[in-house]
Swiss-Prot record:
Binding site for [4Fe-4S] cluster 1: C20, C72, C75, C78
Protein role: Component of the cytosolic Fe/S protein assembly machinery. Required for maturation of extramitochondrial Fe/S proteins. May play a role in the transfer of pre-assembled Fe/S clusters to target apoproteins.
Protein name: Cytosolic Fe-S cluster assembly factor NAR1
Organism: Debaryomyces hansenii (strain ATCC 36239 / CBS 767 / BCRC 21394 / JCM 1990 / NBRC 0083 / IGC 2968) (Yeast)
Keywords, in A-Z order: 4Fe-4S, Iron, Iron-sulfur, Metal-binding
Family: Belongs to the NARF family.
Pfam families associated with the record: Fe_hyd_lg_C
One BP annotation, GO: iron-sulfur cluster assembly
GO molecular function, one term: 4 iron, 4 sulfur cluster binding
Region (Disordered): 401-438
Amino acid sequence: MSAILSADDLNDFISPGVACIKPPAENVNRDTNNENGEVDIQIDNEGNPIEISRLDGTATSLSAAQISLADCLACSGCITSAEEILVAQHSHNELIKALKEKVQNKTDKVFVASISHQSRASLATAYNLTVEEVDRLLINLFINQMGFSYIVGTSLGRKLSLIYESQNIISKKEEKFEGPTLSSICPGWVLYAEKTHPYVLPRISDVKSPQQITGCLLKTLTARDLNTTRDNIYHLSIMPCFDKKLESARPEKGEPESAPNDVDCVLTAKELITLLDEHSDDFSLFPPQVESILSASLVSTTELYTKCAPKNWPFVDLSWSNDNGSSSGGYAYHYIKLAQEHLILKDPSTYQPENFTLKTISGRNSDIYELRLIYKDATVASAAIVNGFRNIQNLVRKLKPSTKQTSTVKANPLASRRRARLASKTDGTASSNNATQDTADASKCDYVEIMACPNGCINGGGQINPPADVPEKEWLTKASENYTNIPSYDLLSAGSNGNMLSELIEWCQEFCKEFDLNQNRLLKTWFHEVEQSTDPNAILLGAKW
């Protein structure tokens, strides 16, 4: 486990497996005829492995087996991720290496960046600044010091993700999909499901996260703007979570393995600080001209947002804006609001806006709660927020398919009567009863917004830790306040041609048409069960501590 990411960062962290069971890939450059015949493996005087031919004594150096992020996605050795691989392949050192290679080799490599809302809030908390001030400093850092061509917020990608996620759930609800649809925005949760609870995969939404949608948009628009190719663009994404590194390596369905990723490197706010500390002679968040950088009287923040984005980047006024709801993006909240809008538009004679109410139902702890959209006395839509692995485990257990009992075990009469009493309380019309229940039950909702970190993405493992003299709760509260203070932009607010919702949908369709891009390539991902290893040696090693 890396020094940057440790179990101390999360209070209900699930430790990774000891053994990585992914077999090393065959070296395609080696001679498949094995001209050396039988060989012995030895260690030379410098500690390097060498291969000695028994035929003529020829010594051949052996290279270390390499494990990629794509390998981690296909490996069941760890429950969520292998941190050493994450940090090694998506590290600030790799970014610095890429920047130096551009200068040394005099290439025309293009560097672009996107940054999440939570990371901006974390940096603002660490430096006691406003998020707007942090934005101005980051733009100066990446554009003026590091030589990036563009930097954007992830708001456009997030808003498209929110829209199509909500539409997906509404469609499933109308198709009588049984049980909740589960969000896929958190890669830690998704990897956990793929490797340990594959029976929930049919429930997981296939709508991409803001990181991946932003990556596709940014590379596509940058390529046209600068007359270059996608594989000549290096996209850095600043995220609150280390598992976002693995998400960036998930291959696109139907594309060759050699196809360039939409995101080339993911760094957390914590890693960005490490980069600045280690390369303080080259880069600084607070250069000598910091006062002029922070002064909005010279250049407004909106002008800065426009200048640092590709020329054809749309909706610049909302590209760094926030969204209502939870600090993980507000997915549950937006489903409820768009479900209400859908009902009103679909049947205006039945549903009047003034008769809707939104009720929040608390769960067993602060990391579980439910949002219910009530029309008069009936629940017409529901969504839950479930944060933290402990709560996730409880949810997936409830969603596990029941198996018919084949043995003739005598039933416990007390247990039977207790189940009967519980059933009598929940029988009847779900709509009317759900409106009056006062305990959140995510397993019975239309949709569940799931995040692996307690308190959601604002408390991601890659966020900056508090100083020793500041309580964690106080630090998290301040970060949450900074996040909330980012100006939000309601999807249902008025736009130039109707509301922002319809304008975004229309723009997305035109974007895909203009670039001959299948909409699924932009918006959809895929998941699959990661089968457990049958290699007894790997299983044995993984059982040892």
